[in-house]
Amino acid sequence: VRLDDVFSRHRPTAVIHLAGYIEVGESVNQPERYLHNNAAKSDILIEASLRHGVEALVFSSTCAVYGLPQTDLLAETHRIAPISPYAESKARVERALAAAAARGLRSAALRYFNAAGADAEGAIGEAHHPETHLLPLAADAVLGLGPAITLLGTDYPTPDGSCIRDFVHVSDLADAHLRALDWLQRAPQRGIHQAFNLGSGAGYSVRQAIAETARIAGHAVPHTVGPRRPGDSPKLVGDISKARHELGWTPKRDLAVQIEDTLRWRRKMPR
């Protein structure tokens, strides 16, 4: 199905662009694949949106566009310096959206930190094949549904040697998308582009997240130690004050809730 046909049939006034490959390590081994799928194909979507009079576009970007942090708390004004093809692909889309503002498109790039959690009822959640995300891997390990989790690097310049990440619940992310869309549609001017950090504003190390999983599950998480994963930053924690102020967004579900929801989902998940 051609994009032009879809736009002509449904005549959308707004687009929420969530699609794309997301694995940092895989992108290092397959850079052309990531740049083609994530960046080049997004260019096609942006051009189609402009041709068909779309007024607003919300894009799922990533905190990985910042690269190696220059400050403890990353604000949207931090330099953009991707260190993986995945991050570069997202940065390219952000640049394309910024350029499209000159042609009248309103857009928001939502820079996710570490998306986590699942539906509170356990009806839906992430199910990658193979799974690469920390919380579902830790959940499977502690529930006996998967192998021991491997800590990818324990020699980072952090207090316990493991990476520090800012985890944000997927339900809070969903709320942010709706708020961003509403913000764009209410904007008085045509042709704007803004980026917003979406995180919790607090950092937890990989070791801390594993320990919290063990506490909630009631017993230790089997784990081993492995080498660093190419393209990983030692610490990524977001300053979310802009999203709070501009979008009226506040994350409501902390790491414990994210882990509880992940455990519930992994128990129920079809395999």
Show which residues each predicted segment covers.
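Conserved Rossmann-fold NAD(P)-dependent oxidoreductase catalytic core, especially the SDR/UDP-sugar
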Residues: 17, 43-85, 99-108
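Short alpha-helix in the Rossmann-fold core of NAD(P)-dependent oxidoreductases
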Residues: 20, 30, 35-42, 58-61, ...
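Active-site segment of SDR-like NAD(P)-dependent oxidoreductases
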Residues: 22-25, 63-72, 80, 113-119, ...
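Short alpha-helical oligomerization interface
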Residues: 24-41, 74-82
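Active-site Tyr-X1-5-Lys
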Residues: 68, 81-118, 136-146
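C-terminal substrate-binding subdomain of Rossmann-fold SDR/epimerase-dehydratase oxidoreductases
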Residues: 137-271
